[in-house]
Amino acid sequence: MAEVSLKILKKHNLEHISELRIDPEILLQRFSPGCSMCHCNGTCCAEGVLLDLKDKERILAHADLIKQYLDPQQEHDVQKWFDHNIEYDIDFPSGQCDGTAVRDGGCVFLDSKGLCALQKTALAEGMDKFALKPFYCVAFPLVIDGHMLTTDDPEFTNRSQCCSIVPDGSITVLDVCREEFEYILGAEGLEEIEKVFKEEVASPVESAV
């Protein structure tokens, strides 16, 4: 099998990564018409998420505000919001990450209506809706793995209750996750990856698998 030449993105919002590689598989994945993150009923918030220590610090700095928007039964002790298990990881700006805790079958910030308390707080207080959310919460189902942009597979791509890859699919990951791509890459980076996807449609890359 011929070696696949990896596409490199130089326009993006990740200051700790100079050249962001694109996983060839995300150029090949196709989904059914109508698949959309807006319609997603997946279970990503049933688990915690890894977050950069700076994201953690920002959440703790707004702890008193966030508590006002928690359900009564949600955890109000800030010391129990995180795993306190620091790991070293090159895909996080600080090089270190922690994880949000899981309580009652979901992320500690997931309320009884399936809403994120962090996003709920930000919207109610006039902030950008993503101001308090960890990077990988907003980016999901896109992830950075070894400075490579890819999808959280099989978490995203093979869900029986959500979007799944199909052989005769007509829409791409970019179609499904445009807002998430723009969050990671910025407006210029979005234009750059749009060109990459258009090139793939014109001349499909060979699967790396």
Model-assigned labels for residue ranges:
Residues 1-209:
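Short loop/turn segments that flank or connect secondary-structure elements
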